[in-house]
Regions:
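Single conserved hydrophobic/aromatic residue that forms the stacking wall/gate
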Residues: 1-8
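Periplasmic-binding protein-like
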Residues: 5, 20, 114-125, 140-142
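Flexible loop/hinge segments that line or gate small-molecule binding clefts
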Residues: 11-35, 144-152
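Hydrophobic alpha-helical segments within soluble ligand-binding/sensing domains
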Residues: 33-55, 158-178
């Protein structure tokens, strides 16, 4: 459908097409849009780090390190955790599927059996949250406010606000300012964020999140800043610089030093 849409858009100059999470565009009336979800992942890592007692945090991941979107999210989460709890470890269990309820259940159970007391996720079902609640520990949801699924466990959820892009895109067509460029918004555009924190978060969590959010919004914190050590002992990045967008979206195939993949 994606390829056909791009092909069919070419001769229809008065209709505008936008594809979420895509990569193809014609620079005219077919564009793609995505967002800096890693910014919200970083904030959620702060929440997780502030609330762990075992210093073991789990992460159910849809894809392995070959997928930069998933891996970048894990690393951003880990960097957020590290900023408040450098001794904590993040254990990742990969399902190799964007949607597999059974695999997501099994992955969450593996992490809970390892005494992870906060379980985050980049997968579609709410099972990591509901299973965390059943065990009496915490979770970090994704895509929607999962506190409705696990009100006693979900510390917060990482969410998208796609309406921010849709409003801007439609307005640009109305105004005649549509320029055919791709879109990559973030917290400054209100495209990504985290939900309100649970009232059972430990003292100081909100303050830590607020400070980090201010730094991200101001540009002081780019999340992937400076020299970053991977879990294989190598380093990426340069002192005084932030990884560029091309690297963030397509070149993060490594894990931060506090991350361990569970086989």
């Amino acid at each position: 459908i994606y390829t056909l849409s791009l092909h069919d858009a070419l001769p229809i100059s008065d209709i505008y097409f936008a594809h979420g999470t895509g990569y193809k565009s014609n620079g005219k009336n077919f564009v793609n849009y995505f967002g800096r979800i890693y910014q919200a992942r970083y904030l959620s890592g702060i929440v997780a780090g502030m609330n762990t007692k075992t210093n073991k945090l789990g992460y159910v991941a849809a894809m392995d390190s070959s997928n930069s979107e998933v891996t970048g999210g894990i690393d951003a989460f880990a960097l957020g955790v590290y900023s408040v709890k450098p001794e904590a470890k993040i254990y990742v269990k990969v399902t190799n599927s964007w949607f597999d309820p059974d695999a997501e259940k099994a992955a969450a159970q593996t992490l809970l059996n390892m005494d992870c007391d906060v379980v985050a996720q980049h997968c579609d079902t709410e099972y990591p949250q509901t299973m965390a609640q059943e065990k009496g520990v915490y979770g970090i949801g994704y895509n929607s406010d999962m506190s409705k699924n696990a009100p006693d466990a979900c510390l917060c959820s990482v969410i998208w606000n796609w309406g921010a892009y849709y409003t801007a895109a439609v307005q640009s067509v109305i105004d005649g300012t549509w320029d055919g460029s791709n879109y990559y918004g973030g917290m400054n555009e209100n495209l990504v964020g985290i939900t309100s924190l649970a009232d059972f978060c430990t003292d100081g969590t909100q303050e830590a999140v607020d400070t980090a959010k201010e730094d991200i919004l101001s540009g002081k914190n780019g999340v992937f800043d400076g020299v970053i050590e991977t879990n294989t002992g190598e380093t990426v990045g340069e002192e005084g610089k932030t990884l560029d967008d091309a690297t963030i979206t397509g070149g993060i195939n490594w894990y931060f030093k506090t991350v361990e993949v569970v086989e």
